[in-house]
Structure formats: structure tokens, C-alpha cells
């Protein structure tokens, strides 16, 4: 527990988010792909809840996520899985309902296990430098870090139960 999120910009259109988790990558992969687990940690910033979490985990399968603010506003996103290599890699394209990223973004999640810990690298490729900079400006990293802190708790429960 207590690992920090490292955010880098490998290119003018990418954001890479790296984090270590004290759990085997099978469990981390499950927390990204099983709706009941994903809903426990990817809840969004304070004041938001994860209202819809539908996953068709197969190549060309879709996912649909909707976060709901306590004031009733919704923020939705639809994505399509392009590559799934359990438990090490997921590639998808995603598009928010209110398209603030100027088109689809490509997300590549790579999970590497070492000594019982998982190194997670999630790289998002945006359509333009401006879209990437917009994601940085709205504080995406802060929200991701809060979610990953919640994921630590979910993983600790899963490890204890196994």
C-alpha cells in the first residue's frame, strides 16, 4: 500500500500512468474486467458514483460506463476492446458522450508482475496534443490516483480472501 501514481507524457499526444499494486496481476486484471470489482474502485471524483458498468470482454466487444454526480448529472463513455491478453494487456478505444477529447482515445493497459506485485502502465493516446493537454488540465491524474487508492483496498480484500 502507499504507492504513488507516476504520470508522464511519452509523446505530444500521450499520457502514461504508472502505479505499483501489492497484488498479483491476475487479481489486478480481474479488477479491471469484472464489473462487480470495477464498480468498487472506479467511482470517479468525490460526489460521483458508478451508475452503469457493462462489459463485453472480448475482442470487438464493447463496454459502457456512466458516472452519476449527486446533483443528477451523468458522464458517460463507450469503448471497444481491440486486444485482450489475459492477464497482461488490454487495448481499447474509448469515446466520452460529451466529446471533450476531440474523438476516440486509445488506451493500452500493460500489467507486469514482479515479486508478487503488479506494475500497471496505462497509456492513453489522444487524437491531438490539445486533447491530451485538456485531459491534463482537468485533473485526470488526480481522479486516477484516487481510484487507484481505492483499488488498493479492493485488492487487499481479494488477496486476504485468496
Residue ranges: model-predicted function:
Residues 28, 38, 63-65, 81, ...:
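Hydrophobic pocket/interface hotspot
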Amino acid at each position: 500500500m502507499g504507492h504513488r501514481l507516476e504520470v508522464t507524457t511519452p509523446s505530444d499526444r500521450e499520457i502514461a500512468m504508472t502505479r505499483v499494486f501489492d497484488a498479483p496481476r491476475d487479481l489486478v486484471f480481474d479488477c479491471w474486467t469484472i464489473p462487480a470489482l470495477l464498480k468498487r474502485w472506479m467511482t470517479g471524483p468525490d460526489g460521483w458514483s458508478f451508475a452503469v458498468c457493462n462489459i463485453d470482454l472480448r475482442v470487438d466487444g464493447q463496454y459502457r460506463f456512466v458516472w452519476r454526480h449527486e446533483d443528477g448529472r451523468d458522464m458517460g463513455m463507450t469503448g471497444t476492446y481491440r486486444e485482450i491478453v489475459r492477464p497482461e494487456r488490454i487495448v481499447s478505444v474509448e469515446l466520452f458522450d460529451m466529446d471533450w477529447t476531440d474523438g476516440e482515445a486509445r488506451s493500452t493497459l500493460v500489467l507486469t508482475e514482479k515479486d508478487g506485485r503488479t506494475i500497471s502502465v496505462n497509456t492513453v493516446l489522444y487524437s491531438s496534443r490539445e486533447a491530451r493537454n485538456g485531459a491534463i488540465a482537468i485533473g485526470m491524474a488526480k481522479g486516477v490516483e484516487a481510484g487507484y487508492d481505492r483499488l488498493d483496498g479492493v485488492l487487499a480484500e481479494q488477496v486476504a480472501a485468496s
